[in-house]
C-alpha cells in the first residue's frame, strides 16, 4: 500500500523516503510515546495499562510510534506457535484474522489523531508471509480514511528527526 502524503498532525510531519526510512519534522517541542510488543490480541495483553498510556499521550498531544508486534496473531491454524487456549474469547470465530484487525481499527480509531507510525514486527511479517495480507497496512489505511495520518514502516529502518 502507498504511504500518505506528508500532513501535519500532532505538531509534526512524517515523510516516507523509502519503505524503511521516514523523516519526522517538527517545529516546536514535541512529546512522543514509543511502544512495542503490545500483542493486542493476546490474552495476556494489559489493555488497561495500554489505555492509560494512550490517554496520557492524547492529553499531552504526544505522537505515538508503535515499533513492531502490535498484533500477536498466533492463533490461526497456519501458525505453528499457536495455542487455541490462549485465544481471547471475542476472537474465537471463523474469521479470526478479520476479527482481530476490525477490533484493532475500532480500538485505535479513538486515538487516530496521535497514532502516527506502525512498524512491522515478526508477528506482522509472519502473517504477511503466510497469509499474503498486511494487517498494519489495512489498519493504517482505515485510520487515514477516518482523518488520521498513520504511516507504516518496515521490520527495520530509520527515523530521522529533523527537517524534511
Residue ranges and their predicted role:
Residues 154-158:
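Short, acidic/polar N-cap/turn motifs at the starts of alpha helices
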Residues 159-164:
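Short, intrinsically disordered, charge-balanced linker/junction segments flanking boundaries
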Residues 11-13, 17:
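Acidic, low-complexity intrinsically disordered tails
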Residues 2-7, 19-35, 40-153:
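Core catalytic region of metal-dependent phosphoesterases/phosphodiesterases
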Amino acid at each position: 500500500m502507498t504511504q500518505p502524503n506528508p500532513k501535519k498532525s500532532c505538531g509534526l510531519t512524517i515523510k516516507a523516503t523509502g519503505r524503511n526510512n521516514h523523516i519526522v519534522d517538527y517545529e516546536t517541542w514535541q512529546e512522543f510515546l514509543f511502544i512495542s510488543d503490545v500483542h493486542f490480541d493476546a490474552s495476556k495483553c494489559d489493555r488497561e495499562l495500554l489505555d492509560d498510556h494512550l490517554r496520557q499521550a492524547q492529553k499531552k498531544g504526544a505522537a505515538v510510534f508503535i515499533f513492531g508486534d502490535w498484533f500477536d496473531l498466533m492463533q490461526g491454524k497456519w501458525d505453528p506457535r499457536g495455542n487455541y487456549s490462549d485465544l481471547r474469547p471475542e476472537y474465537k470465530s471463523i474469521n479470526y484474522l478479520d476479527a482481530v484487525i476490525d477490533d484493532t481499527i475500532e480500538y485505535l480509531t479513538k486515538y487516530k489523531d496521535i497514532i502516527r507510525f506502525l512498524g512491522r514486527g515478526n508477528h506482522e511479517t509472519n502473517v504477511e508471509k503466510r497469509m499474503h495480507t498486511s494487517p498494519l497496512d489495512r489498519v493504517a489505511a482505515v485510520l487515514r480514511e477516518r482523518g488520521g495520518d498513520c504511516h507504516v514502516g518496515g521490520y527495520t529502518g530509520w527515523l530521522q528527526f529533523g527537517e524534511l
